[in-house]
């Protein structure tokens, strides 16, 4: 007796006809449709939301009306809860947004009633308003301190050539010196001058008239680089040297650095005749820990 354990490779009839089993094999569909097949066979329906929406923002729970989330059409929240996009839910059925929810309550309060955060939270809420693209909230916050003052400060710094580059240079020089010396802090010299030609006759006011008698060819005699690590200036604005020093300390402190500075004199380099450079030199002390 012969036991057949398999089927002949070619089970089709010689006349080209197929058996019923052959037909079933040829039209057998996979148990799980592929993404392409599913997209054609089962188009996704718009997601529907309840009138009262439970939210999970990075683990922080909130509850609000659907109309509140949609109150400004051109925002990320309005788009997310328009039904055109799928939003996952957590185990409790709350709609989940993978974002830190610390300041989302301030965002909701603005959407609900136009309330604005206190000054100490303005910067943090501004970042959330940027993320959720809430234009009206951004406009309101930009007119509050400290952002309003920051706009004025940046307008001044916009007149300062290479301000950001020089700021980074201060940090890099201080870091390298601290590493090389195995020291807790590093010192460097910074020249800050406002005027285009911060040069005066040395200890002789009567020679001030010579300042205006120089020819254009003499200008090259007055051009030089002070022996410092970084120089800032000149600029044309009401803000003076002390305002720029305040900006430097503010921006360096924002990087977590401890900054001290003091004026240690002027360049005092002899240029020509009775003229010496009177650009002020400041010593910056950057403490790393």
Curated annotation (Swiss-Prot):
The keyword Cytoplasm applies. Coiled coil: none annotated. It is found in: Cell membrane; Cytoplasm, Cytosol. InterPro entries: BTB/POZ_dom, SKP1/BTB/POZ_sf, T1-type_BTB. One of its GO terms (cellular component) is plasma membrane. One of its GO terms (biological process) is protein homooligomerization. Keywords: Cell membrane, Cytoplasm, Disease variant, Epilepsy, Membrane, Neurodegeneration, Neuronal ceroid lipofuscinosis. Changing residue 84 to W: Found in a patient with opsoclonus-myoclonus ataxia-like syndrome; likely pathogenic. Residues 1-35 are annotated as: Disordered. SMART domains: BTB (SM00225). GO terms for molecular function: identical protein binding. SUPFAM superfamilies: POZ domain. Residues 51-149 form the BTB domain. Pfam families: BTB_2. It is linked to Epilepsy, progressive myoclonic 3, with or without intracellular inclusions: A form of progressive myoclonic epilepsy, a clinically and genetically heterogeneous group of disorders defined by the combination of action and reflex myoclonus, other types of epileptic seizures, and progressive neurodegeneration and neurocognitive impairment. EPM3 is an autosomal recessive, severe, form with early onset. Multifocal myoclonic seizures begin between 16 and 24 months of age after normal initial development. Neurodegeneration and regression occur with seizure onset. Defects in KCTD7 are a cause of opsoclonus-myoclonus ataxia-like syndrome. Opsoclonus myoclonus ataxia syndrome (OMS) is a rare pervasive and frequently permanent disorder that usually develops in previously healthy children with normal premorbid psychomotor development and characterized by association of abnormal eye movements (opsoclonus), severe dyskinesia (myoclonus), cerebellar ataxia, functional regression, and behavioral problems. The syndrome is considered to be an immune-mediated disorder and may be tumor-associated or idiopathic. Interacts with CUL3. PANTHER family: BTB_POZ DOMAIN-CONTAINING PROTEIN KCTD7, POTASSIUM CHANNEL TETRAMERIZATION DOMAIN-CONTAINING. May be involved in the control of excitability of cortical neurons. This is BTB/POZ domain-containing protein KCTD7. The gene is KCTD7.
